[in-house]
Amino acid sequence: MLHSRVSKVLVHSLTSALLAVGVLGAQERPGDKGETAEAKKLRGRPAHPKPSEIDSAANLDALLSRKDKGAFSEAKGATIEGYVVQVEREEDGDYHLTLASAAGETDTKKWVIVEVTPAWQKKSAELTGNNLRKLLGKKVRVTGWLYYEPDEDQPDPRGTRWEIHPVTDIKPAS
């Protein structure tokens, strides 16, 4: 009986400790907004989209004009081109790059957000903060996964809730 109680206490303590350090369950990062496990999974995808997974209809203009959640599939990736008009590091470690069809665009309704996660920053030198900041004002081609940002009360301005998140590749565009 005593052995059984001690075992239960030890299992409970070990489980609590593993949850606390993020070994079990979804690990929270600073700035997490309490999103669902599914949202975290989508935003944390570890692989590049395969060519067969790229939605060729999902370009910058299409993301801005087809804004509803059913317009695209989060199971697909996309490659979009645009000028980088903002680069910001968020509290959760993601880098938000704002893309628009014109350099220096100030109309937020013409902006698309693409996000580079800390995991992808570690995977590719092109995706580190220093290199991302160098892209400001330049035209780029961004590849990654389509993601619909559900937080409609979010104060940041944008032209659409559709994002590329995570970004898996950025290259200069001609």
Residue ranges and their predicted role:
Residues 27-174:
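OB-fold and OB-like single-stranded nucleic-acid-recognition modules
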Residues 12-22:
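Bacterial N-terminal signal peptides
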Residues 10-11, 162:
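Short, functionally important structural connectors and interaction interfaces within domains
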Residues 1-7:
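N-terminal secretory signal peptides that target proteins for export/translocation
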